[in-house]
């Protein structure tokens, strides 16, 4: 069995200043050549990818397989029961759009679960490298202090904190970053001792699009439109997807919602190009807010003139309230024993903010007074925002700020979630020509296909508690499965 701690220590031992400078120079060249930037910020700012052992990856896959039936059951129940659906706090226009049959069964053919995963065991490192410049870095934590902490009794900890069921970004970024890392001098040295396998994602996206299209009734070869505003910082990823789709023989354009018309039963880009398959990256809420419910794309999808992935019905589970629905004791009767065990194991205690009584730590309590009194134990999240917008970390807010945020949440739907451990690992970067290693917090975000299984993983690093590249700062790194060579 491969020991992750040993592998990372060995990688860092290979990364002297000379190899670090050479690797960083090559990475900088590749990031610019392939336009791997989020707006004007490079996607990756460190010199090591994320490593997982096969056992750790299988643990993630098993957990996703265990929890997804509960999400699926919640979605099916919500579609058929308006009273139950009210728990998701959909707006009036969302209630209208989820009535549109997308033409295929999965509400989210492409999705991502955002999690915090602290694998175990990680044995203490017996090796120090005092001669390395990294050890001299001001503010660097001592080796070992930032390693993922095990849970009670030494088990791994894995908590699902958000389900991105609408527009899961970065599969193409991940693929290209994997290629970039494979060619670095440091990886050439590391691969002599470890097998390193990537987790590609673009082909899964293409499969999901085509499966949905054929289910929808498409017979001709589709023309794909990647749909989002032209000014978004993720535009460079759309270019990567366009290049990939075209390499597989599919005509593809990148189109701004403002460029569409719906005329004579056809969805037209630039007024002339018929589109029958939409890879939707624009947020439905932004599309409706900026363009209205009579927008060409909304009309075309509603009238079965175009297939769209993900469909309007993805909004039900994309709401952060979906985790509250799973976690709430009032809904426990819906789930099988296996589903309930998965919820208890992986979903942190989560509730929609309201004046109510509920169960917490085995007792019935008044929700709002508890949240006010124990702010350091909770995080407050708007039900339908992205990029870290509106999130309030109770342990970083003063009492006045926290109580004001709670009051505001009574009017604008929000969830409160019990604080989870934030794992960290040491990652090297080049600072003023020398390799320096700092502990960085990280999340682990499995890609989920058809609401069923996991393949691929997004890893984000940060020195702040809010791990989100959109929120500013941070770094994306590709994730590899590693095994020590015999």
Language-model features: where?
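Preference for protein termini
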Residues: 1-486
């Amino acid at each position: 069995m491969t020991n992750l701690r040993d592998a990372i220590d060995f990688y860092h031992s290979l990364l002297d200043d000379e190899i670090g400078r050479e690797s960083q120079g090559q990475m900088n060249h590749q990031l610019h050549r392939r336009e791997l930037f989020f707006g004007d910020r490079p996607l990756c700012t460190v010199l090591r990818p994320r490593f997982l052992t096969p056992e750790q990856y299988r643990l993630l896959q098993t957990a996703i397989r265990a929890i997804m039936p509960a999400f699926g059951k919640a979605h099916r129940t919500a579609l058929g029961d308006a009273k139950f659906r009210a728990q998701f706090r959909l707006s009036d226009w969302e209630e209208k759009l989820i009535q549109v049959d997308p033409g295929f069964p999965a509400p989210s053919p492409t999705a991502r679960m955002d999690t915090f995963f602290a694998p175990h065991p990680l044995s203490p490192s017996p090796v120090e490298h005092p001669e390395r410049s990294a050890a001299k870095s001001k503010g660097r934590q001592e080796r070992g202090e930032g390693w993922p902490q095990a849970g009670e009794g030494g088990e791994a900890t894995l908590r699902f904190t958000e389900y991105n069921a609408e527009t899961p970004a970065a599969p193409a970024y991940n693929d290209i970053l994997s290629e970039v890392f494979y060619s670095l001098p440091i990886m050439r040295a590391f691969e002599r001792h470890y097998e390193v396998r990537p987790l590609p994602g673009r082909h899964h996206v293409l499969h999901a699009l085509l499966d949905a299209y054929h289910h929808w009734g498409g017979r001709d070869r589709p023309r794909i439109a990647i749909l989002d505003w032209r000014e978004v910082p993720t535009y460079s990823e759309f270019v990567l997807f366009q290049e990939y789709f075209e390499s597989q023989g599919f005509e593809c354009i990148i189109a701004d919602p403002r460029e569409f018309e719906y005329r004579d039963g056809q969805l037209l880009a630039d007024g002339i190009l018929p589109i029958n398959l939409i890879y939707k990256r624009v947020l439905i809420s932004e599309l409706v807010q900026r363009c209205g419910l009579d927008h060409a794309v909304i009309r075309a999808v509603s009238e079965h003139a175009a297939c769209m992935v993900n469909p309007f019905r993805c909004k039900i589970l994309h709401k952060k309230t979906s985790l509250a629905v799973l976690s709430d004791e009032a809904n426990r009767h819906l789930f099988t024993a296996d589903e309930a065990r998965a919820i208890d194991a992986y979903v942190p205690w989560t509730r929609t903010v309201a004046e109510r009584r509920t169960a917490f730590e085995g007792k019935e309590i008044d929700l709002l007074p508890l949240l006010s009194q124990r702010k350091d134990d909770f995080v407050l999240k708007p039900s339908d925002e992205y990029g870290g917008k509106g999130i309030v970390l109770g342990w970083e807010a003063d009492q006045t700020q926290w109580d004001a945020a709670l009051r505001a949440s009574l009017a604008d739907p929000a969830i409160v979630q019990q604080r989870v451990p934030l794992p960290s690992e040491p990652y090297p970067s080049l600072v003023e020509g020398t390799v320096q290693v700092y502990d960085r917090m990280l999340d682990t975000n499995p890609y989920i296909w058809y609401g069923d299984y996991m393949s691929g993983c997004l890893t984000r690093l940060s020195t702040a508690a809010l791990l989100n590249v959109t929120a500013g700062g941070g770094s994306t790194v590709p994730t590899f499965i590693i095994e020590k060579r015999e």
